[in-house]
């Protein structure tokens, strides 16, 4: 019975995303695509999808071995591929990356997929200001730095910026997630502003409010392991469809119904939560 319920939940709440391979090849073949968080999970799935249609890749992540393997795979498919292993939280390394990106012949797409998730209550983080520094540096500052660096190139090509956010940011703040949600919401707002300001330049900005995706990072939380989730490849398809379309954002259909309701009942939920911890 439980398996049947899970299968039904996957079917209803995580419908299989489809992407037109012909359209994908038309839009991405020969284009330069920058992907952060490219060594694993969604970023790696995105890179594999794009190399199969002939895109040129600039891959950024911390894991050098995995990045090099992806670059070798792309080059074996006659794609140009560059890998850059660094920590985007390191400001000097980020500055160096930005300088190198300025040397690219062109940039057509920037997929900002690198991210860090921390679940810790604020009272337990009084000696851990670095939790907030790390999430803001990676989830917010690195996105802004790369986008500002590549804006001139994106203007020349009519390029697109796609940011991987979380559907949880559409709901009332949840206890334990202050560092993560604050950093993701900051980037959501920045992208909304950039979308308004950059559209006259011909540059598209998109935000993907993804639901749970089965990756190494998300599955580190034992509470998520038995829940329905998209695969990394499913999430990559969602990002690609968003990049090829005209919508500012993607969000699951069910969040359009449940998020407004959650905000209505948020005061009541907070009340009972506060009572439960007294």
Tell what function each PLM region has.
Residues 147, 183:
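Active-site helix of classical SDR
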């Amino acid at each position: 019975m439980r398996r049947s319920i899970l299968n039904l939940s996957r079917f209803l709440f995580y419908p299989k995303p489809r992407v037109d391979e012909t359209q994908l090849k038309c839009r991405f073949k020969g284009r330069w695509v920058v992907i952060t968080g490219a060594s694993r999970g969604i970023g790696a799935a995105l890179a594999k999808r794009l190399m199969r249609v002939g895109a040129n890749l600039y891959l950024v992540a911390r894991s050098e071995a995995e990045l090099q393997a992806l670059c070798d795979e792309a080059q074996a498919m006659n794609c140009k591929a560059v890998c850059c292993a660094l920590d985007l939280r390191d400001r000097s390394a980020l500055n160096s990356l930005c300088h190198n990106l300025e040397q690219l012949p062109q940039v057509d797409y920037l997929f900002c997929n690198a991210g860090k998730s921390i679940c810790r209550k604020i009272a337990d983080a009084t000696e851990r200001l670095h939790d907030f520094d790390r999430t803001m540096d990676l989830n917010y500052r690195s996105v802004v730095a790369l986008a500002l660096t590549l804006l001139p190139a994106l203007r020349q090509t009519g390029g697109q910026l796609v940011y991987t956010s979380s559907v949880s940011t559409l709901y009332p703040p949840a206890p334990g997630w202050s560092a993560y949600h604050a950093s993701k919401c900051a980037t959501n707002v920045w992208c909304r502003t950039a979308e308004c300001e950059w559209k006259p330049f011909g540059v598209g900005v998109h935000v993907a409010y993804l639901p749970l995706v089965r990756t190494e990072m998300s599955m580190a939380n034992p509470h998520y392991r038995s829940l329905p989730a998209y695969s990394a490849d499913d999430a990559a398809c969602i990002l690609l469809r968003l990049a090829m379309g005209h919508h500012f954002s993607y969000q699951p259909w069910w969040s359009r119904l449940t998020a407004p309701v959650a905000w209505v009942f948020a005061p009541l939920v907070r009340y009972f939560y506060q009572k439960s911890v007294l």
